[in-house]
UniProtKB/Swiss-Prot annotation:
A GO cellular component entry from the record: plasmodesma
EC nos: 1.14.-.-
Named cofactor requirement(s): heme
Major localisation: membrane
PANTHER family from the UniProt entry: CYTOCHROME P450 705A1-RELATED, FLAVONOID 3'-MONOOXYGENASE-RELATED
Family: Belongs to the cytochrome P450 family.
Transmembrane portions of the chain: 4-24
Record membrane topology: Single-pass membrane protein
Name listed for the protein in its UniProt record: Cytochrome P450 705A12
Length: 499
């Protein structure tokens, strides 16, 4: 009996020592400044933390939204041993980017660093630093500057014309089309011509090959969180992209063009050859950026076009008003063009409302580079920042009837021309990221979406099965998609090519 008591005492002593040791480790490595508390946190479970809260829906943004409705717009969560801060309101998102813009300009380090697809050589995945700053400047002052967009306007007009002619062919055959697919072909062809210029055409197969590789990459995005398990697949697509883009680079180097015909690759190669550049970029970084331009500029715009067309078809009043605006501005003898867009405020409002309700990436992920304070709460370094853009853009404290499709909310007349209200709306409207890492191609994306939707509304009536388009959501990788792709049959309403 005495021996058992001694053994029990020893076990208790060991247990107490382990508890003390654990407490000391926590105090040393996870201590926070005096007077600071972590953001509020829902009830958690041992080991898994708050994982069970995220299993309420197959859609992560919906699970996060449900949590924020119940516990508040700023939450501290833990998934196993990974800490995160969840932001779910416009005011809280504004506060984070206002006070910690640089600190939250960091992203996750990709597992497959060597890959051109989702790797670490690109601009989007690059850590905040000299390379990222140099590329941001190059994109803003060379690749997407207003003069460059003006020079490439003719290519975009050609592709829009081809897009409408293809739809006319479907209409004559009374064939249905999948809006997402035809929109993806349009955006892919435009990006191809803007980035590769003379190397890209339907005839030489370059545009088709680019589409094929983009589709393979999107298929891999579903496996992104298990990239160690699918490294072979990811690296396989990366090698295909590398071989494809190397041929394009060599072709550009062998056939240098004048300033009038320069495309994105020409500008990137110029920076690559410049020995006095602020930062010396590599061929791999050029290829990674082109891959990111294709992945970021094609599917996201195509998905928004699809979602917005679905909303338009479900709201006949919006369709009628939008069509009347286009007819009055464009007239009855030509196709809508980019120069019309500033005179089409309702079309702009329709696209903004589509983006508000259906952001292509519903959840924004960043990393706090250093410990900091957010609304008097302490956030440790290396904590993951999760901004639920879906919830932010449907925040009932910021938007009237937040779940309804009401483009009028974006018309200046609807907010009485009050500059303060206009500024407030800009703060709460977050669709292309936030802070200094906001997408630099916002203007180009709006051109894609507004001209495509404008042309489809101007030139065609659309027949759907049933009375309404089914709007169920699905998530593929980090993208918000329609669970049931929008299929409808075009009927020619106006032929702009008959004059």
């Amino acid at each position: 009996m005495a021996e058992l008591i001694i053994v029990d005492f020893q076990n208790i002593s060991i247990f107490i020592l382990l508890c003390l040791f654990s407490f000391l480790c926590y105090a040393l490595f996870f201590k926070k400044p005096k007077g600071f508390d972590l953001p509020p946190s829902p009830p958690s479970l041992p080991i898994i933390g708050h994982l069970h809260h995220l299993l309420s829906s197959s859609l992560p943004h919906k699970s996060f939204q449900k949590l924020s409705f119940k516990y508040g717009p700023l939450l501290h969560l833990r998934i196993f041993n990974f800490p995160m801060v969840l932001v779910s309101s416009a005011s809280m998102a504004y506060e984070v980017f206002r006070t910690n813009d640089v600190n939250v300009s960091y992203r996750f380090v990709p597992v497959n660093k060597d890959s051109l697809v989702f790797g670490s050589s690109g601009f989007v995945t690059a850590p905040y630093g000299d390379y990222w700053k140099f590329m941001k400047k190059l994109i803003s002052t060379k690749l997407l500057r207003p003069h460059a967009l003006e020079l490439s306007k003719g290519n975009r007009a050609e592709e829009l014309r081809r897009f409408c002619l293809d739809l006319q062919g479907k209409a004559r055959k009374k064939e249905s089309v999948e809006i997402g697919k035809v929109a993806l072909k349009l955006t892919n062809n435009i990006i191809c011509r803007m980035s590769m210029g003379r190397s890209c055409s339907e005839k030489n197969g370059v545009a088709e090959r680019a589409r094929e590789l983009v589709n393979k990459s999107f298929a891999l995005s579903v496996k992104l969180f298990f990239s160690n398990m699918f490294r072979k697949d990811i690296m396989g697509v990366s090698r295909e992209f590398d071989e494809f883009l190397e041929r394009i680079l060599v072709e550009h180097e062998e056939n240098l063009e004048g300033d009038q015909d320069r495309d994105m690759i020409d500008h990137l190669l110029e920076a690559y050859r410049n020995e006095e550049a602020e930062y010396k970029i590599t061929r791999k970084q050029i290829k990674s950026l082109i891959v990111e331009i294709f992945l970021g500029g094609t599917d996201s715009s195509a998905q928004t076009i699809q979602w917005t067309m679905a909303e338009i078809l479900n709201n006949p009043g919006v369709l009628e008003k939008l069509r009347a605006e286009i007819d009055s501005v464009v007239g009855g003898k030509r196709l809508i063009q980019e120069s019309d867009l500033p005179n089409l405020p309702y079309l702009q409002a329709v696209v903004k409302e589509g983006l508000r309700l259906h952001p292509s990436a519903p959840v924004l992920l960043r990393v706090f580079g250093e410990s900091c304070e957010v609304k008097e709460f302490y956030v440790p370094e290396k904590t993951t920042l999760v901004v639920n853009l879906y919830a932010v853009n449907r925040d009932p404290d910021s938007w009237e009837d937040p779940d309804m499709f009401k483009p009028e909310r974006f018309l200046v007349s609807s907010i009485s021309g009050d500059e303060e209200k206009i500024r407030e709306q800009a703060v709460k409207y977050v669709t292309f990221g936030g802070g200094r890492r906001t997408c630099p191609a916002v203007k180009l994306a709006h051109i894609f979406m507004e001209t495509a939707i404008g042309a489809m509304v101007q030139c065609f009536d659309w027949r759907i099965k049933g009375e309404k388009v089914y709007m169920e959501e699905a998530v593929s990788g980090l993208s918000l998609k329609m669970a049931h792709p929008l299929k409808c049959t075009p009927v020619v309403r106006f032929d702009p090519f008959s004059f």
